[in-house]
Design a protein with these regions (language model features):
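Rossmann-like adenosine-cofactor binding region
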Residues: 22-117
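Short, structured coil segments at secondary-structure junctions
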Residues: 13, 32, 121-122
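Residues at the starts of beta-strands that form the adenosine-phosphate
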Residues: 7, 15-16
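Aromatic pocket-lining residues of Rossmann-like dinucleotide-binding sites
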Residues: 6, 10, 71
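Rossmann-like dinucleotide-binding domain for NAD(H)/NADP(H)
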Residues: 74-184
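Conserved SAM-binding motif I beta-strand of class I
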Residues: 19
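Hydrophobic/small residue at the entry helix of a nucleotide-binding pocket
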Residues: 2
Length: 184
């Protein structure tokens, strides 16, 4: 959802769009003019790389030394997703070399501490923000409605596809705690 929204905005600036997502719907990507590529092609070809992935066992540390070194001189890495997706030490090292630029608002430890080494980097090459990009009136309204809809669906016995771990129903605690709501 976030990636598609970003792609639509980038298209307005006539950007050439490529993406790496092993689970992407090719037809949707084609309809938006997005070329799907492998991760190394994305890293080596892009002027801007925006990370919008979820943290899963497959994505933790997906951007490391090899991927960062593949980036073009002065390309910009943008991370508004989660810090765990990028190897922090590798990112710090390449930023100290001055090869790439970066903008990010996610940290291994939030809020950022005053002695964080990223604070010593050249502010013309690195934009550091607190984790707040998702805070907008529209986002808050969307999440509030989605939460209410999910609760109503749950109480009506409807699985609307938003249950991340379907095995939760097999956990004994669900019978004792979840069942209280379910049987109400």
């Amino acid at each position: 959802r976030n990636g598609l929204a970003l792609a639509q905005r980038a298209k307005a600036f006539d950007m050439n769009l490529i993406a790496y997502d092993p689970y992407a719907d090719k037809a949707k990507a084609d309809a938006l003019g997005i070329q799907l590529v492998d991760l190394m092609t994305l890293m080596s070809s892009s002027d801007y790389v925006s990370i919008l992935a979820r943290v899963t066992p497959e994505t933790v540390g997906m951007i490391g030394t090899k991927e960062l070194n593949a980036m073009k001189q002065d390309a910009c890495l943008i991370n508004t997703a989660r810090a765990a997706l990028v190897d922090t030490n590798a990112l710090l090292a390449i930023l100290k070399q001055g090869k790439i630029r970066a903008a990010f608002e996610v940290w291994d430890q939030e809020p950022i501490s005053g002695d964080n080494p990223f604070l010593d980097l050249d502010p013309l090459r690195v934009l550091l923000l607190p984790h707040f990009a998702g805070c907008s009136v529209e986002r808050i309204t969307f999440h509030s409605k989605a939460a209410a809809d999910n609760i109503i669906n749950f109480l009506n016995g409807i699985d609307n596809g938003h249950i991340f771990d379907k095995n939760v129903f097999d956990v004994p605690a669900f019978e004792t705690h979840g069942g209280i709501l379910w049987n109400s």
